[in-house]
Swiss-Prot record:
GO cellular component terms given for this protein: plasma membrane
Name this protein carries in UniProt: Adenosylcobinamide-GDP ribazoletransferase
Superkingdom as given in the UniProt entry: Bacteria
Keywords from the UniProt entry: Cell inner membrane, Cell membrane, Cobalamin biosynthesis, Magnesium, Membrane, Transferase, Transmembrane, Transmembrane helix
Protein source organism: Shewanella sp. (strain ANA-3)
Main location: membrane
Recorded coiled-coil stretches: none
One of the GO BP terms on file: cobalamin biosynthetic process
One matching Pfam family: CobS
Keyword Transferase: yes
Transmembrane region(s): 43-63, 66-86, 120-140, 146-166, 191-211, 242-262
Function: Joins adenosylcobinamide-GDP and alpha-ribazole to generate adenosylcobalamin (Ado-cobalamin). Also synthesizes adenosylcobalamin 5'-phosphate from adenosylcobinamide-GDP and alpha-ribazole 5'-phosphate.
Gene name tied to this protein: cobS
Compartments (UniProt record): Cell inner membrane
Length: 262
């Protein structure tokens, strides 16, 4: 394979990842199959970078003319519109299942139900409120820091969530599941590029902030793995969405705490 063909393949994979995790349409010339979708997992972090960057741009463009809370809300709306609430939906389904089921089978069945339950509604409300409040505090501290935090959090949270595909068991047998093509374990190339995208984006932070966030994300990933294994024995597409949302919130929390003590 020539260098040009290799670059074309990588661009194809990024566009597949973008089309899967956002509402941004893929070019018509991009062909999608299960193998491509699995390999595209290497670029999930870069998709987060794109979503975070666009959300940050909306915030930066509006924060001089609008109250911080409104600018933050507009940035959050931008993120939801770009992704179609993909991860938020997974968060709600996960909390409905984990909160309402006794056995792993019950939890998986409840998570499959498209209706929103009380546990999912509470989780969505609390996460969105907490995300808004943390970002408002960051915006009042420094608008540049707040926008940078959006970029970092959207990227790193997706890296952590997608890394679960590499180590954990996919527990749905339903062939119609949208996440089924992702369920094959990632190769070393996929994992390396995925982690590299997360590490590189940390370079926008100060040394202590980057190190603190890295250590917290490593610990949080381990905690998420333990919980998912105990609850359902592995992961589903919904739990990956929940992991992304939780990691994003924790990113903002860490950056706010570190920023306040520097």
């Amino acid at each position: 394979m020539s260098e040009r063909e290799s670059w074309h393949k990588e661009i194809d994979l990024f566009l597949v990842a973008m089309g899967y995790f956002t509402r941004i349409p893929m070019p018509k010339w991009v062909e999608v199959d299960a193998d491509k979708l699995n390999k595209a997992s290497r670029y999930f972090g870069l998709v987060g970078l794109l979503v975070g960057l666009l959300s940050a741009i909306v915030f930066w463009l509006t924060q001089n003319w609008l109250p911080a809370g409104v600018s933050v809300l507009l940035s959050m709306v931008t993120g939801v519109l770009l992704t179609g609430g993909f991860h938020e939906d997974g968060l709600a389904d996960t909390f409905d299942g984990f909160g309402g089921g006794w056995t792993a089978e019950d939890k998986l069945r409840i998570m499959k139900d498209s209706r929103l339950g009380s546990y999912g509604a509470l989780a969505l409300m609390l996460v969105l409120m907490l995300k808004w409040q943390l970002l408002v505090e960051l915006a009042l501290y420094d608008p540049v820091v707040a926008g940078s935090a959006m970029i970092v959090a959207h990227t790193v949270s997706r890296v952590v969530a997608a890394s679960l595909i590499f180590t954990e068991k996919y527990v749905r047998d339903d062939e119609s599941s949208k996440s089924k093509p992702l369920a094959q374990h990632q190769g070393i190339n996929e994992l390396f590029i995925l982690i590299a995208s997360g590490v590189l984006v940390l370079l926008v932070l100060k040394g202590i902030a980057a190190l603190s966030l890295l250590l917290v994300m490593i610990g949080l990933r381990r905690l998420i793995v333990v919980i998912f294994r105990r609850q359902i024995g592995g992961y589903t597409g919904d739990t990956l969405g929940a992991a992304q949302q939780i990691c994003e919130i924790v990113c903002y929390f860490v950056l706010l705490v570190v920023g306040s003590i520097l």
